[in-house]
Amino acid sequence: MYVIGRSFKFANQFENIDLNMVYVVASFHDLAHHIDKDNHEVLSANLFYLNEKMKEFFTYEQRGIIKDAIEDHRASLDHEPRSIYGKIISSADRNVDIISSLKRTHAYTIKHYPELDLNEMINRAYNHISEKFGDCGYAKVWLVDEEFDKFKNDVKELLKDKYTFGIKYMEVNNIIDTKEKKKIKTL
């Protein structure tokens, strides 16, 4: 619902936007994430494009635009989205909350890197958030987004001090062991 709501917020900034297309792009954009995280945008776009019901509602041209928009939503996309619908979904899909970023990064780390100790988890989270949302981060928005701008400023502030970052990471993820807190001073 988060991405759908943000998509409508962005869509309302423009005239002649088909809100049905916006809704479908937002609804399908991560549909295949559970199948293959690394290629989910292509798989999700294909699930949409091959869906017989969608062929009843949208023209061939509209379906092509929707497919392209779904493919273009990734934060790591190396080019500008091909349509306004791609810019809307790509911008809407950006996280604007530091707490959820820290929680998502922690959950991903625990699942995919269970061997890491606390310092390594914090370092991984620090590096990931810096690479994605820092000054030269790859996550972009293609439309005016004051929420994302504020989020980027919050991230910039948090990344200034690794120790403060580590404390915040632990607080957000309910890591309260005081022995562990002492360990992060070595970061």
Regions found by a protein language model. Name each.
Residues 42-84:
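Helix-adjacent hinge/juxtasegments
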Residues 1-21, 34, 43, 48-56:
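Alpha-helical phosphate/pyrophosphate-handling elements in metalloenzyme active cores
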Residues 1-16, 28, 77-187:
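Divalent metal-dependent phosphate-bond-processing catalytic cores, especially two-metal-ion Mg2+/Mn2+ enzymes
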Residues 17-40, 44, 65-75:
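His-Asp-centered metal-binding catalytic motifs of divalent-metal-dependent phosphohydrolases/nucleases
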Residues 39, 45, 50, 106, ...:
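General N-terminal targeting signals
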